[in-house]
Each structure stands twice: as C-alpha cells, then as structure tokens.
Amino acid sequence: AGFAKAQGDIVITMDADLQDSPEEIPGLINMITNQQFDLVSGWKKKRYDSVFAKNLPSKLFNWAARKTSGVKLNDFNCGLKAYKNVVVKNIEVSGEMHRYIPVLAKNAGFGKIGEKVVLHQARKYGETKFGMERFINGFLDLITIWFLSRFGKRPMHLFGALGSIMFLIGFLS
C-alpha cells in the first residue's frame, strides 16, 4: 500500500528498529540521482546479530538468492533501500516478498541495481522476528520468485514438459 501512495521521485524503505541509520539515506539517493541506478540496496557488511541464529542463515540465504535470481547483491535482507518511483509503481509486492524487491525489479526490466555498504547497529527497539519459520518461508518465497521469473510468461514450458514425461511413462508402462 505504501508504494502505491508514494509520490516523490525517489522512494526510501527502512526497518523501524533503527538498526539501519537514517544518515545513510543521502548516500543511497546520490547513487540513484548521480549514478543512474534504478534501485540501491544497503549492505550490512559488518553485522551486530547472532552468528548462528542470523548471520550464517543470512549468508546462506543471500548466496541462494544470488544464484537463483542473477541479482548480484550481498544483502537481500537489508531493509534500507532506495528506488526510483517508477520502479515501485511497476512491481507487485505481496506477503513477505519485500526481500525480493530487487529481483522483482530486475524481472520488470529495471536492471541497474546497486549496493552500498551501510552502518549496521545493535537493535535499539523491539525484538527480531527472524526464526526458523521465517527462514523456511524465505526459501519457499525464493522458489516462488524463481518459478515466476523463469516460467511466469510461459508456464507450459514446465507443465508441458512434465505432462509429456508423465504421458510417455504411462504410455510405455
């Protein structure tokens, strides 16, 4: 709903827990206005999170997201991002797909995606919502994005091939 209401030329998103510093916003805006990026994502290169509970799963998730999407970001989960308004007006984000906005943008034809190292701070407010359920749902969402980007406009390439294989197996047995 927020993207639909956005009116400025550049749209900024960030988490409410203040682990990302608002002072980073001008740097993101600069990359969009002066370097012509469609979207710039923050990269929490030095993190202040639990190694086993968050850092390692995040590294695994980011590696899988890079491999399946072709988007070369180090930190898909960073909530601090800047977008040209035209980008957010041309993508559909639902459920927990917010972490895949760069992939959705790429699939919508916005391929100039940048990344900027941002300061990550210890959590000041609230508690993390990250857990095993969110980790699993993140990978299921990744599979959904991969499927939609690969077969969304030609689903018969997958279903037709699977149906043909099943038909042949049934015919031959």
Cite the ranges covered by each PLM segment:
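Conserved alpha/beta core of the MobA/IspD/sugar-nucleotide pyrophosphorylase nucleotidyltransferase superfamily
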Residues: 113-116
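Acceptor/aglycone-binding surface of glycosyltransferases and processive sugar-polymer synthases
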Residues: 1-5, 22-100, 104, 121-140, ...
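Short aromatic/hydrophobic "clamp" motif used to bind/position activated sugar donors
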Residues: 11
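Basic/Trp-rich segment in TM-proximal cytosolic loops or flexible interdomain/linker regions
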Residues: 123-173
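The conserved acidic donor/metal-binding loop of glycosyltransferases
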Residues: 15-19
